[in-house]
Amino acid sequence: MSKKWTRNTAAMAAILSALCLSTNALATSEQAVTDENQTTTQQEGMRFEPRNEKFAEAHAEQYKSWKATQESEEIEDALEGDPNMVVLWAGYGFSKDYNKARGHFYAITDVRETLRTGGPTDDKSGPMPMACWSCKSPDVARVIDDRGEDGYFEGKWARLGAEINNAIGCSDCHNTGSEEFAKGGPALQMSRPYAERAMETIGKKFEDQSRFDQQAQVCGQCHVEYYFTGPKKSVKFPWDKGTSVDDMEVYYDEIGFKDWTHGVSKAPMLKAQHPGYETWREGIHGKNNVTCIDCHMPKVQNEDGTVFTDHKVGNPFDRFEDTCAQCHTQTKAALKSVVATRKASVLEMKLRAEKQIIAAHFEAKAAWDAGATEAEMEPILMDIRHAQWRWDYAIASHGVHMHAPEVALRILGTALDKAGDARAKVIRLLATKGITEEIQIPDISTKVKAQQALGMDMNKMNAEKDEFLKTIVPEWDKQADAREAKY
């Protein structure tokens, strides 16, 4: 079943998928009356309390609005909406399954259910590393605090499935054990040490920043580009040379990193994650000190007049007077028209880039089949790598048509250029092999047809996932309940 949200809403929810609690008590600290006697029920001595319900009484409005993210219940299959992506990610997990993001409430459910994490049969099997939990739960911060980063990252995704069971919540972004938080203040914190190091790399040490920068940094713990490095597949942000798409491309090339080898062209590929922080910095909102919460987590009043930060992340147009109208003088209809135009422009460029990159993948395959050498193919494959990296960077930055449309259009334009370069080179190479006719692309008009064209056994994958959900996950939940009963 397709989600009934508008596509604008889905995009906005995705870009804020980890922003929701970044400023949980921000408005409370500014405008709501704080209670000197107000306390939480956090376990004494526990630095990261992962159980969000423990804050339901002391931070009732924030908790209630956070819990309302469960209203984004229905799932929208992004591969059905754009089957091109199946081929673009051939050989990688995203070709199996890619859904639009839902609210924070579903973070654990969704990562368990996606085909990308496979159907592990024990704590040592499955396709993905532990790092795939890293932005899904405050339990991650708890485990890192208990065991260190090496103790967290080591092994497969299923290794600590019984430890990571609470959805994205309060302790991801707030120091919930602090006196400030207990009294209703925001107590923002960087709960992921690898993210804190990355911010220092770009000269933004958390404690030295303004509240504005800290708000964005807390969100940027998760809504960023990152990759897995070293034998333990630890998370690292590729910011050593800067935070632009060009800077990160150079960084990846210099260290010889690839996420996977493409299943059609054999190109060494990069998979962009969700670089919302980076594109926001480049866009008009970031440059004007408008943060994520200003648009997606506005300050609102409850019935008794208490002002708090609304944690039900969604489309700013749903709360126009509390969001857009705080800065813009245009009517809601006028602004919606502007956003729709920008979104259409980005979508058009996205689809144009996809068409060219897909053609390049199949033409590269034809060249390999015709006997091309690695030396002949290297410059072609690098152009394909760079073209798709740029395409992916633009489209993975959810809501970029709103946050930084000019950035998205520029990047997609360079993706088109690089795909064109790849195709020109491979067509010349094919000619030297005696191939001058157009290379045919199989029918990829639907998700099912595209997966069939790649020879993917979806029945097997789905059966393995179903068995995992039926047998392994209930055991995880039992173990988690037993552990938390001892807190």
Curated annotation (Swiss-Prot):
Enumerate the cofactors the protein uses.
Answer: Ca(2+); heme c
Question: Any idea what job this protein has?
Answer: Catalyzes the reduction of nitrite to ammonia, consuming six electrons in the process.
Query: What's the protein here called?
Result: Cytochrome c-552
Lineage of the native species? Bacteria, Pseudomonadati, Pseudomonadota, Gammaproteobacteria, Vibrionales
Residue positions binding heme c 5: H285, C324, C327, H328
Organism, scientific name: Photobacterium profundum (strain SS9)
Named in its record, the pathway it takes part in is:
Nitrogen metabolism; nitrate reduction (assimilation)
Q: Which GO terms describe its biological process?
A: anaerobic electron transport chain; nitrate assimilation
Q: Where is the signal peptide?
A: 1-27
